[in-house]
Amino acid sequence: LGVFKSKGRLNKEPTSKYRSPFQRDRDRIIHSASFRRLKHKTQVFVNTEGDHFRTRITHSIEVAQIARSIAKYLNLNEDLTETLSLAHDLGHTPFGHAGEDALDECMESYGGFDHNLQTLRIIMFLENKYFKFKGLNLSIETLEGLLKHNGPVEDTNLVNKLIGLKTFKRKINFNTYPSLEAQISAISDDIAYNNHDIQDGINANLFKLEELMEIDFFKSIYLKYKKKINKKNYKIATYQIIRDSIDLMIRDLLANTQKNLKNLKIKSIKDI
């Protein structure tokens, strides 16, 4: 069910004897200027508020770690999954989604702004490091996974306006669901930020660990450690509860994924 063979790139290149197409994609992302710029962009907190709050770059690394673990268990392509995870936030603005909303309003007469499509603009046009082509010339599978981060493309007019449908050279079907690797990357994004935003919020004293009791999902986890929690080990308890939460979400995801694959009789990539 995994993607282990590439359809190639929009611009032909010699293959590598030492790295798969998806390893090369990952390496190009890591060495890009846009990836380095993520270190100053934050999820929730302003970058200057503290060294320990997460930035887009630390978030992307955490997403990649979660996604690789899931992909490995399901016998999918870990390199493609990691590539999509590392690249998924390249198009984000500073100041989180508020920054995106402000820029979208400013760019309304030019088609608006969408961070997922901006990610594609960056890797396809704005990162210029090669004589023969613009962008990073990533594999078709990586482009498709990023384009369909939220599922099949519903607004092809917006894609055409901001990127150009002809750019994809008819190598991507906009109406189908993305690969399992892309779906894992997307849900790993949710797992990472839902847990880590809570951890950052507690560390910033915006709310207390005890308040998680109001959320049914966290209540059972909190009660496991309630008797052990005190002022001295409060931070350790926070780490433990967040760690258990991530583990529970991953185990639930794996169980339901295997159940769905069986019930829906998914036998090949085409079935996805």
What is each of the regions a protein language model found here?
Residues 1-60, 64-70, 113-117, 122-272:
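Histidine-centered, transition-metal-coordinating active-site segments
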Residues 14, 68-80, 109:
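Short pre-active-site segment immediately N-terminal to the catalytic Zn-binding motif
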Residues 30, 75, 91-94, 110-111, ...:
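Short coil/turn residues that cap or connect secondary-structure elements
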Residues 74, 78-100, 119, 189:
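His-Asp-centered metal-binding catalytic motifs of divalent-metal-dependent phosphohydrolases/nucleases
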Residues 79-83, 94-111, 202-210:
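Post-HEXXH active-site segment of zinc metalloproteases
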